[in-house]
Every structure is written in C-alpha cells, then in structure tokens.
From Swiss-Prot:
InterPro entries: 23SrRNA_methyltr_KL, DNA_methylase_N6_adenine_CS, RlmKL-like_Mtase, RlmL_1st, SAM-dep_methyl-trfase, SAM-dependent_MTases_sf, THUMP_dom. The keyword Nucleus does not apply. GO terms for molecular function: 23S rRNA (guanine(2445)-N(2))-methyltransferase activity; RNA binding; rRNA (guanine-N7-)-methyltransferase activity. Residues 46-157 form the THUMP domain. This is Ribosomal RNA large subunit methyltransferase K/L. Keywords: Cytoplasm, Methyltransferase, RNA-binding, rRNA processing, S-adenosyl-L-methionine, Transferase.
Length: 754
C-alpha cells in the first residue's frame, strides 16, 4: 500500500472553512474545499490524527480508487479490480454507502448492491466462504461517490460519524450535533477566551452539548478519545502500533488538561426534565469537575464566576416549536437581551438562531454574523460584545417618575413610550408623545365636580401607588352615583368602563354625563385623549363576558410586583389583569418558593407568573379558553419563564376529577357563571362551590394552602365546607386602597385541611 493517501473529510454544510483550517493544522496537505467536504493528502499518522482530533468532521474517507464510469458494468468491474484481500478477510462483514446518480445509476440502493456484489465476488473462496453484510457494525464500511461520470471509492476510517462522541446518550427535542456545537464555539472565540482563563455560561443549555464541547476544548481533550470502535479496527491496512502511539499522546494531553484548575463553565435550563440527562452527559464525558448544570429561567439568568472573571455567554434559543407562537419567542429573545445587558456587562455573547429577525429584538448590536446550517435549516451565529455602546434600547421610566410627572402636569422630553404589540407579537410603532400639558376643555358644572373628584383621588392614591411601586390601579369607582364609571390607570393609559344605567334613568341624561366625564378625564389625569379607552359594562351571561369588543389585537406591557404582564385595553371587556386581585397575586408570589402551584380558572395566568417569580418549583394553570392560555404563554415568555410552567386547556371540574398530582399552593378564582360548547353542563359558583372545593382539596398536599375567591356579590359560602376544612375569610387582607371604596369587589378565603 501507498505511504500517502487521498482523504475526503465530510462535514455539515457551512463548516467547510473551519474544517480546512483544522485539518491543515492536524497535518493535511494540498487541502481543497468542496461542498460539505475537504479534500487533501496525508500519511497514515495524519489520517489517524484527524479521526482522533477533528472536532468538526463527520467522516474521514480514505480514497482507494478513482475510475471513469459510464454504466453499471463499469461500476462493477471498477470495484472488482481492487485487491480486496489487502483490506478485509473473506469471512468479514461490510456495509456499502452509495451517493450520487447518473451513468445508468438512478437508484442509490442499486448502486450499493453492485458495489457489494463486486467485493463479494472478489473475495469468495473456492469453499464458498464470502463476506456478509452488517449495516450497523461492519468490519469495513465502504463508500462510493459518483461525481460527473467519475466513481470515487473510499474506505470510511471513522466508522460511525465522528460527531457521535459517546457522551450524549440522552438528548432534548432539538439538539445540536456535537460537531456543529464545536464549530459555533470556535467561531465564537472560545479557544481564545479559554486560553485566557475566561468563563462560559449557557442560559438555555438543554442537555449540555455546548458545555461539554467547550470543556473538551479548554482541557485539550481529543473529541473521540473514548471511542472504542473505529472503521479501521478490522481493516488489514491498520497499523495498531502507530494508532496506540497517537492515542497514548492524546490521553496524556487530556490528563494534563484535566489536572489544571477547572474553568468556570455553567449551564442553566428551565425544563426540569432535562437537568438530570444533562448532568449524566457531563458525567459520561468525565467533566463533572468542570461543568455544573442548574435549573434556572432565562428571566433570572445571572452568571457569577468564582473570581468575577468575564467570558462567553453562548446559547441556542428556540426558533421553532419549542415555545409555541411567534409572540412567545419574541418575548424570550427580548428577555435574553435584557439579561445580557443587565447581568453580563463586558462579556462576549454568541447567539445561534434560525430566526435572525428575532435576534434583532434583543436590543444589542452584533458586531459579526456567520452563516451556518442546522440540518436543512439556515441559521445565523450572532456575535455580540456586551458593552453599553452596543445597546439599542432606551431606558423605561419608573413608576415614581411617571407619578411625579402626573402630579406636576409635565412629561419628560425624552420619555420612552410604553411598549405595545399586535396580536402576532410584533411591536407597533409608537405614536408621537403627547404634549406636556393637555389642552383645557370647557367643562359643565357637573363635569368640573367630576374632574375635581378625579384629581382628589389621584392625589391620594398616587402617593400610595408611588410608595408601593404600583403602576396600574383604580382611580375612580362610581364614587359619584351620577357618574357611574370605573376608571383604571395602566401606566400612561386610562381604561374607562361605563356601568349600564338602570332603566329608570333617562338615557339622554346618562349620555350627557358620560360626555361630561370623557371631557374631564384627560384634564384631570393629564393624559392625551387618544390614550383613553371607553367600554360599557353590563351584566354578563354565559360566554358573553369573554367575547371580543373589537379586534385591534394590541397588547401593552405593564409591570407589577417585579414582573411584566401584557394587557389588552381594547379587545375584551376585561384587560387580562384583574387589578382588584393584586394583593392576592403578591401573597402568592411571597408564599410560592419551592412549591407546586395550581391556578384554576387561570384566565391569563397572571397569578402563575407571580408564583414563578416567587420561586415556585412548578406551576400548572388550567382554563377552558385557548385564547387566554395563549395570552398566558406570552406572559410567561415575557418574563423568561418557560417549559416548567404547564398550561392546560380544559373544563376545570373535569380536569380536577381526572388529576392525580398533588399541589402545595392552589388558587381558585372562578367566574360567577360559565357555559361553553367545550364543557359539560353549566358552571354556577354558588351551586357548584362544594364540588369544586372538594375536588381541589383532594389535590392539596399535606400542609398545603388553598385560596378561594370570587366576585359574585350575593355569594354565600356553604356551611358544610366549614365542617370539612379549616376556613378563614381573608377578604379585608386582599383589598388594596384603590378598591377600598367597593367592599363587594370580591370575597376571599384561606382553606386548609383540618
């Protein structure tokens, strides 16, 4: 056999440039780049070294012969001419892979059969002994590639693809192949950062592929050091002594690398189902001293290396089905950008994404972009220096600043507008900022009295809201009977609900008073009239309470208790955030740490988001409406919370009846009345309270707490419940000053086991 061989190194599309640099560094000569491959010349030592050390190649193919081919007979005889007795035993096993078409070969299976037949015929002995086919673990894996009338016959030295390092026996739903992960790390500058003693963190680490590949690079570990079965193991041209020499050298380098102080390499994953598989992969790779994986949400990501060193944040955020709709993904990317700006200043970041447009929503410029392919999906690698001059997002005003501006009837010249999104989650270009002082309209005597009451309420409640950091609150609730309105502030927006007047009231007078109020509201609250939304609130029945009022599909981001929530001020009677339950949500946030939280009739799951913020071990939210569960999903994503927060669509009573899980903290806020095509029968809170609470208490873990609330003004708690459970009415503790004027806004109870 020759001392020098032609080699083909195959790789994923897009890695050719990196692979040729790596291969030349490992000794490949006369290297040339091809589509998804690199070609060059090497001796046997270099071929072995490429198998052992290439982090990027899929396969190392040793070319046995090239020959022209016009038809299937040329193929057969070209393969037959090879001295196969120099390569394998007559009783050995083989597998054949065929690629390309033409020259009478239009079916790769047929082409592979012709190659196999030629090899078998060449090696068949007079006694009938002949090679057999083993597609899984053959002694020799033969590859023939047909390229423009030329057949290239090769021996696959690698055996199984080199990306299969052996440590990743458990993986997530959409993993990166190991060699693609290594390529991303190399493009991201990790070898340089690691050589300088830098840190690495992955806020969405899945089962830890980036982490393991990064540690192997930093510790100088050959990626295939632990592989036991190779394509050359049973090859008759194999030189075992040469291979042992190279393997021993690689083993010594790995031992020396692992003897060094470990770098700080950490991964965080929201999905609790992936934590142990990720740790198992790390342990199989022998890197438990270098890598730690923790459960954590993107919204709380904050790398804190032991010596405060900087380094690389690298991640592969979802860009397909992992989180659901586009809006959820948008919020996730925005949240990732926010955490980079807030917690990773002076770090470098690398974001690998199949949705580059979402990458633009992170609020940080990328100084370099590289194109890759993840299978058949085109992707981009965005490289970022996390420095203030790279930030492209403005600062939001605080609640205190907004309240001062209201009190002083001024607006800051550089005010950042409230973020708004359409139903697809895309930002809406904000309207020009309103003038600092709202133009004064002539008010009637009644209108002036109404304005005075609004200003008085705003002054009193504004101080409380400022002190408590509350941005959304009720400023007026039918305080004056003739002006029967509920008025809520949502940051810089005013949400007005008109209570339908009784039939005894003259409709014309009621209309005139409404016009008086609408004229007074912008002046009294110092808002532009375009930011006042008016609705009529009537007694609701059935599903009417959930029907659309309009179809603008615009969502506004607000803040409450350290979290962000989406409200829709136009499309539904309610906005997606029940302001009267603010104290209950804060209570849940304070009590949720380490607990399994269940939210029944969850609406947009705002209480569940508070529970997640408070450190709940898990949250489960159940509602019949897909619309509100989609909204809930966006609320979670907006805060960087993800898969450990379950959203279940279904009839609550039926769901509870079939549920077998236990929960430590349960919140139930049912509607007064509900019916739907998707539920059996009709729900009536007064009639069905006993069945509802019995089913829910059956799911309460020992020592757990259930909170029950509803807003049916005539509701009476069934006396039989007090005999079964320890029940304490806590209504007064769940009403803030902005709802103190309406003592019947809701009632609430704390329920525990006796």
């Amino acid at each position: 056999m020759s001392d020098r061989y032609e080699l083909f190194l195959t790789c994923p599309k897009g890695l050719e440039g990196l692979l040729i640099e790596e291969a030349v560094g490992l000794g490949l000569e006369q290297a040339r780049e091809h589509t998804s491959a690199v070609r060059g010349m090497a001796d046997m030592e270099t071929a072995y070294r490429l198998c052992l050390w290439s982090r990027l190649a899929n396969r190392v193919l040793l070319v046995l012969k090239r020959f022209p081919m016009k038809d299937a007979e040329d193929l057969y005889h070209g393969v037959l001419d090879v001295d196969w007795q120099d390569h394998m035993l007559a009783d050995g096993t083989l597998a054949v892979e065929f690629s390309g078409h033409g020259s009478g070969i239009d079916n790769t299976h047929f082409g592979a059969l012709k190659v196999k037949d030629a090899i078998v015929d060449k090696l068949r002995t007079p006694t009938g002994e002949r090679p057999s086919v083993d597609k899984l673990n053959p002694d020799l894996r033969i590859h023939l590639r047909l390229d423009r009338g030329e057949a290239i016959l090769s021996l696959d030295l690698s055996g199984h693809s080199l990306h299969q390092r052996g440590y990743r026996l458990q993986q997530g739903a959409a993993p990166l192949k190991e060699n693609l992960a290594a390529a991303i790390l190399i493009r991201s500058g990790w070898p340089r950062i690691a050589a300088e003693g830098g840190a690495l963190a992955d806020p969405m680490c899945g089962v830890g592929t980036f982490l393991v590949e990064a540690a192997m690079i930093a510790a100088d570990i050959a990626p295939n050091l632990k592989r036991e079965q190779w394509g050359f193991t049973a090859w008759l041209g194999h030189v075992p002594a040469l291979w042992r020499k190279l393997h021993d050298e690689a083993l010594a380098r790995a031992q020396a690398g692992l003897a060094k102080p470990p770098l700080w390499i950490r991964g965080y994953e929201a999905d609790p189902r992936l934590i142990q598989p990720g740790r198992n992969n790390v342990e199989r790779a022998g890197l438990s001293e270098w890598i730690k994986i923790y459960q954590g949400e993107v919204g709380t990501f904050e790398p804190r290396p032991d010596q405060n060193q900087k380094g690389l944040v690298i991640c592969n955020p979802p860009y397909g089905e992992r989180l659901g709709d586009e809006a959820s993904l948008l919020y996730l990317y925005q949240n990732l950008g926010g955490r980079l700006r807030q917690a990773c200043l002076n770090w470098e970041a690398a974001v690998f994404t199949g949705a580059p447009d979402l990458g633009k929503r992170m609020g940080i410029r990328s100084h370099k972009q590289y194109s890759f392919w993840n299978g058949a999906l085109p992707c981009k690698l965005l490289l970022i220096k996390v420095l203030p001059d790279q930030f492209v997002t403005g600062e939001r005003r605080t609640a205190e600043q907004r309240q001062v501006e209201r009190e002083q009837a001024q607006a800051a010249a550089d005010e950042a507008p409230v973020r708004q999104y359409n139903k697809n989650g895309n930002p809406i270009k904000p309207a020009p900022a309103p003038a600092p002082v709202v133009e004064q309209a002539r008010l009637s005597e009644g209108g002036q009295m109404f304005a005075n009451r609004l200003q008085k309420n705003l002054k009193q409640l504004g101080k409380w809201a400022k002190r408590e950091g509350i941005e959304c609150y009720r400023v007026y609730d039918a305080d004056m009977p003739e002006y029967s309105l509920a008025i809520d502030l949502y940051q810089d927006w005013v949400h007005v609900q008109e209570y339908a007047a009784p039939k005894s009231v003259d409709p014309e007078k009621a209309q005139a008073r409404l016009f008086d109020a609408l004229a007074a509201i912008p002046q009294a609250l110092n808002v532009d009239k375009s930011r006042v939304v008016i609705k009529r609130r009537e007694r609701q029945s059935g599903t009417k309470q959930y029907e659309r009022q309009s179809a603008q599909g615009q969502f506004t981001e607000v803040r409450e208790g350290g979290i962000k929530l989406l409200v829709n001020l136009t499309d539904y009677l309610d906005t997606g955030l029940f302001l009267d339950h603010r104290p209950m949500r804060m209570r849940i946030q304070q009590e949720a740490a380490g607990k399994r939280f269940l939210n029944l009739f969850c609406y947009t799951a705002t209480a569940s988001v508070h529970a997640a913020k408070g450190g709940a071990r898990s949250t489960t939210s159940v509602d019949l409406s897909k619309t509100y569960l989609d909204w809930a999903r966006r609320n979670f994503s907006l805060n960087g919370f993800s898969d450990k927060n379950r959203l279940e669509q279904g009839d609550v009573m039926a769901w509870l009846d079939s549920c077998r899980d236990e929960f430590d903290l349960i919140f139930i806020d049912p509607p007064t009345f509900s019916n739907s095509k998707r539920m059996e029968g009709v729900f009536d809170v007064q009639r069905d309270q006993v069945q509802l609470l019995d089913l829910a208490m059956a799911r309460l873990a020992p020592g757990g707490v259930l909170y029950f609330s509803n807003n049916f003004r005539k509701f009476q708690l069934d006396e039989n419940l007090a005999a079964r459970y320890q029940i304490e009415e806590i209504t007064a503790k769940t009403i803030d000053p902005d709802f103190a004027r309406n003592g019947k806004i809701h009632r609430a109870w704390k329920v525990t086991a006796r």
